Amino acid sequence: LFRDVTNKAIHLQHFEGKRVALYGPSTYRWIVNLFGIILAGKDVVLVDSFLPHKERESLLEKVGVDYILSSTNQYILADSHAIMIPGAEKDDVEGEYNPQTPEGNVLVFTATDKESDKAVVLTTQNLMYTVNAMNHHCYCSEHDRVLAQTMLFHIFGLVYSLLWPLANGACVCVGRGLRHIDAETYYYKTTILPGTPSMIEYLKRIKAFNPELRTIVIGGAPSSYKLFENLKDRNYNVYTIYGMAECSGGIAVNREMDGSYELY
């Protein structure tokens, strides 16, 4: 992963623009592009690939992107109108990466009941603060297998399904898509499962919790106490995350039956 990310960063440093939109399914190539953009010193704008074209264009216009990397264009660098840049078909990895390059920021979109989507700018320091705070509450190690079924362009998925496990040396198991969602936990022998309340409720209902699973992290939407209680009664370590994009996805965590939250 590090070699691929570094090569992507070297390639992107040949281009002057400072802000890159990234959208596509959560795959290994998406992850490489995410970290490559950041290491190249450019801001990465995470966009929902399922958005209608005009809505996506409107969001990107708001934040003023210089380039686009998308699965539609096979992650070949394109301009702000999604037109592939001549000569960018193959990554140019000539030269060496300068480790002193300042890291780029991560932009995610958020929305409220009264306002349309707004971009939130998060630094790597912001994100790692949340990761380190989570480590004070929940154990994750290089022996764990964390299933990343949640959308990685959402702050909950980005932090708890990708950054947190990688920071602890755990194996991140990228979901293979909706067709396989019922069998992913058994296929990967998952030990830690982050998910939204509806996702966890569904997997519980279809008996998709594999024998190796020991920890469930719930977030991304309000969760019922009934779900928390039911999972605790089955002897799982359960963590309910309260957070917003503006706070790097972490404000507090609940792991006790009394419903109390511990602040990050």
For each feature predicted by the language model, list its residue ranges.
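Conserved AMP-binding/adenylate-forming
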Residues: K8-F50, M151
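Hydrophobic alpha-helical segments in the ANL/AMP-binding
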Residues: Y28-L46, E57, M134-H136, I155-N168, ...
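Flexible, low-complexity linker/hinge segments
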Residues: E57, Q74, A78-N105, T130-V131
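Conserved AMP-binding A3 loop
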Residues: Y97, N105-N132
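ATP-dependent adenylate-forming carboxylate-activation enzymes
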Residues: D4, G24-P25, V45-L60, Q149, ...
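Gly/Ser/Thr-rich phosphate-binding loop
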Residues: T191-G195, L203-G259
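Conserved AMP-binding/adenylation subdomain of ANL enzymes
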Residues: M128-R145, F153-I192
